[in-house]
């Protein structure tokens, strides 16, 4: 039975990243009462937490948009739905509410709050994520070593070393190059996982790329002052006042894995209507898996609309999946 402090809504969105925020807006567009829960203290998901300054190049209508600006626009758009935000809280349990008229599910949060919803939409991205540590970085976090770059200003005039070969490493190298005194990118392999266009831009810049290498030691008096780079067994020391470890993340779906959802390689299997295998539970965005899946923000927006429209007939059996075009006059 739900407790007295249960929140009653039509749709509960789990995850407040770009896909979740657009789903929130769209739920309001369909006239639904919506609540949004996220384990992070701020809206915007990975963009806010990891790369608010990054220029995003694959969102329709924007040749380029800074991460924080995209989030601000999505938050403003979602505000039209008058959502209830439940931030810095984790969804821990889910069960059907047999006593609810026409059916509902109850989601329990880690602070004791329960949300009773006619449908649930999971837009949790990669789930809870924690950065992979830099082996030589023990004890240096916050003293010159960081995992994220929320602002470029602290790197002005510094010798910066970025460790990694993925999109984050190359994006940060490209953006810090005009700000820092020098930027060195260290990667253990010759090949890179980053987008080829970004790799080529970094290669054409003043960034020094060192491959088949690792940061084997960090030195300094209380703060980072230099690093040791080992290449093919040969070590050299170079000045560094800032290190960014962009080695990827360890993702964990957390309590979602205990809900009976069909999980495939940390992703939720959905059908073409974005339904999961559980009644009244839908999913959209990077967390989903289906044949031909492409993990892009732009794709998440479309999946959000698909999920909300199909959830509409679950929330209100008299509703239609297709609501009509928003551009049509009344």
Swiss-Prot record:
InterPro entries: FAD/NAD-bd_sf, FAD/NAD-binding_dom, Fd--NADP_Rdtase_type_2, Ferredoxin-NADP_redctase_2
Pfam families per UniProt: Pyr_redox_2
Top-rank taxon, per record: Bacteria
Entry binding sites for FAD: 19, 38, 46, 51, 91, 129, 286, 327
Cofactor: FAD
Reaction equation(s) it catalyzes: 2 reduced [2Fe-2S]-[ferredoxin] + NADP(+) + H(+) = 2 oxidized [2Fe-2S]-[ferredoxin] + NADPH
Key words of the record: FAD, Flavoprotein, NADP, Oxidoreductase
Molecular function terms, GO-annotated: ferredoxin-NADP+ reductase activity; flavin adenine dinucleotide binding; NADP binding
Its EC number(s): 1.18.1.2
Gene3D superfamilies in the cross-refs: FAD/NAD(P)-binding domain
Cofactor: record remark: Binds 1 FAD per subunit.
Known partners and oligomeric status: Homodimer.
Family from the record: Belongs to the ferredoxin--NADP reductase type 2 family.
Name by which UniProt lists this protein: Ferredoxin--NADP reductase
């Amino acid at each position: 039975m739900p407790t007295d402090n249960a929140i009653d809504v039509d749709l509960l969105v789990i995850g407040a990243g770009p896909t979740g925020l657009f789903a929130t807006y769209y739920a309001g567009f369909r006239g639904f009462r919506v609540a949004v829960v996220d384990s992070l203290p701020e809206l915007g998901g990975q963009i806010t937490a990891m790369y608010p300054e990054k220029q995003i190049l694959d969102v329709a209508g924007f040749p380029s948009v800074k991460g924080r600006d995209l989030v601000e626009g999505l938050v403003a758009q979602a505000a039209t739905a008058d959502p209830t935000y439940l931030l810095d809280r984790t969804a821990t349990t889910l069960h059907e509410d047999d006593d609810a008229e026409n059916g509902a599910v109850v989601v329990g949060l880690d602070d004791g709050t329960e949300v009773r919803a006619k449908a649930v939409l999971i837009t949790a991205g990669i789930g809870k994520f924690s950065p992979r540590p830099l082996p030589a970085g023990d004890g240096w976090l916050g003293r010159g070593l960081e995992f994220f770059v929320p602002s470029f200003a602290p790197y002005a005039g510094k010798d910066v070393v970025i460790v990694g070969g993925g999109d984050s490493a190359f994006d940060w190298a490209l953006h810090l190059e005009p700000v820092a005194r020098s930027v060195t990118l260290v990667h253990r392999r010759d090949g890179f996982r980053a987008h080829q266009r970004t790799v080529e831009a970094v290669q054409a810049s003043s960034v020094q790329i060192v491959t088949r290498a690792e940061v084997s030691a960090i030195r300094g008096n209380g703060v980072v002052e230099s690093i040791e780079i080992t290449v093919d067994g040969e070590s050299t020391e170079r000045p560094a006042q800032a290190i960014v470890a962009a080695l990827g993340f360890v993702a964990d779906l957390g309590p979602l894995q205990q809900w009976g959802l069909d999980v495939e390689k940390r992703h939720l299997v959905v059908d073409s209507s974005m339904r999961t295998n559980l009644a009244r539970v839908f999913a959209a965005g990077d967390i989903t898996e289906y044949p031909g899946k492409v993990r892009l923000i732009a794709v998440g927006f479309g999946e959000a609309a698909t999920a909300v429209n199909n959830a509409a007939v679950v929330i209100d059996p008299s509703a239609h999946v297709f609501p009509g075009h928003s551009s049509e006059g009344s």
